[in-house]
Amino acid sequence: MSILVKNNIHWVGQRDWEVRDFHGTEYKTLRGSSYNSYLIREGKNVLIDTVDHKFSREFVQNLRSEIDLDAIDYIIINHAEEDHAGALTELMSYIPNTPIYCTTNAIDSINGHHHHPEWNFHTVKTGDSLDIGNGKQLIFVETPMLHWPDSMMTYMTGDAVLFSNDAFGQHYCDERLFNDEVDQTELFEQCQRYYANILTPFSRLVTPKITEILGFNLPVDMIATSHGVVWRENPTQIVELYLKWAADYQEDRITLFYDTMSNNTRMMADAIAQGINEVDPNVAVKIFNVARSDKNEILTNVFRSKGVLVGTSTMNNVMMPKIAGLVEEMTGLRFRNKRASAFGSHGWSGGAVDRLSTRLQDAGFEMSMSLKAKWRPDVDALEICRQHGREIARQWALAPLPEASVKPTQQQENCACAAAATADLGPCMQCSVCQWVYDPALGEPLQDVAPGTPWSDVPDNFLCPECSLGKDVFDVLATEAK
């Protein structure tokens, strides 16, 4: 099956609805992907890229239904990775002498994958062109390390289509091909996820390369990517986003992620987030447990954030393995213009938080003070965590924060509980597992416990909203039990 892109250009690629892992297991393709190949039929017939190797036979079979393979005059390989050039071996078994146009580095990559040095390679560099008849040309632009050394883009004159390789793409599968046809929220989420997890390390190269391409003063009516949609409506919108993302991008957002053995570090994360929100209710705060969250979503949020707090329990004097792995990935992604702080709980001996702080600093983050707790944090320790969050909010604020935005402290809230006790509602009760506090003056509306309900009148089937345990794990709040 083919889809008309424009005039004599057709999409002859492959949709992959089922793929969930890309680059090994490093990128979760939660919405599938597509491998975009394009057939140009002008005075010369040109094939731009192929598809992933696992679809080789299907690709060649579908291509044969579109064109006699012997009629293909040129093959353009913009990128030698297997999801782009994977079907070459199958295709070349039918047309072994067809010229392949690619960069010098691509020959090494193609031979490394396919082991056919006898193929008819023709190397190109930036500014080279290929006449394809009917007054049209293909112009080549090398884009090394966006994101492989062999990468290039191909521009078609006349139709003003830029075949952009991996740039401006998304791992996003849809039966509809064009950007104006698909769900816009999904599309831009996947664009940002793709940039954050794949292209961020090369941000320093993105702006000068885009500037170089724009310097050719060539009109761009469409951008035909290697994955995801073809940009036909306002195609330069994605170019503008790339320029924005490449410029040390950050939003007014803070990301916390952690791993925990006994929920102690989770309690710290929750309290830190509360403190941040007390001081700066306008900042977006996102919390992730790495054991239960999509790694690429975490990294996308780090990319969007002005700062990140990373938490870990101590195990064998070092950080938890999932945290160590994620910090290693952040090191490779080379995030810039971001701050960081480490936190975590330990038992008889620590070590993980200091190690984590060093690793975050080595990864290029501007470090703030770290925070440690021993064993399960009690009321006082959780207040220290909230205070840490308040300080982080002030230090990381993008603009001065008004004093009026500060909420009551935990001590003030405890005073409110004491006032409730004097009003004959009885004491506040604290969950001994997660430290959540039941205040009789407030009740718990989500479980139909009305404000003003003393603990003795709370139904026996009441569950702690934080840890879902019953009334038997609650004790009188420590400040009232003294």
Swiss-Prot record:
It is found in: Cytoplasm. Fe cation 1 binds at residues 79, 81, 147, 166. Residues 426-477 form the Rubredoxin-like domain. Binds 3 Fe cations per monomer. SUPFAM superfamilies: Flavoproteins (SSF52218), Metallo-hydrolase/oxidoreductase (SSF56281), Rubredoxin-like (SSF57802). Signal peptide: none annotated. The gene is norV. Fe cation 2 binds at residues 83, 166, 227. Residues 254-393 form the Flavodoxin-like domain. Pathway: Nitrogen metabolism; nitric oxide reduction. Fe cation 3 binds at residues 431, 434, 464, 467. In the N-terminal section; belongs to the zinc metallo-hydrolase group 3 family. GO terms for molecular function: electron transfer activity; FMN binding; iron ion binding; nitric oxide reductase activity. This is Anaerobic nitric oxide reductase flavorubredoxin. Pfam families: Flavodoxin_1 (PF00258), ODP (PF19583), Rubredoxin (PF00301). Keywords: Cytoplasm, Electron transport, Flavoprotein, FMN, Iron, Metal-binding, Oxidoreductase, Transport. Its cofactor is Fe cation; FMN. Anaerobic nitric oxide reductase; uses NADH to detoxify nitric oxide (NO), protecting several 4Fe-4S NO-sensitive enzymes. Has at least 2 reductase partners, only one of which (NorW, flavorubredoxin reductase) has been identified. NO probably binds to the di-iron center; electrons enter from the NorW at rubredoxin and are transferred sequentially to the FMN center and the di-iron center. Also able to function as an aerobic oxygen reductase. Residues 30-210 are annotated as: Zinc metallo-hydrolase. One of its GO terms (cellular component) is cytoplasm. Homotetramer. It comes from Enterobacter sp. (strain 638). SMART domains: Lactamase_B. FMN binds at residues 260-264, 342-369.
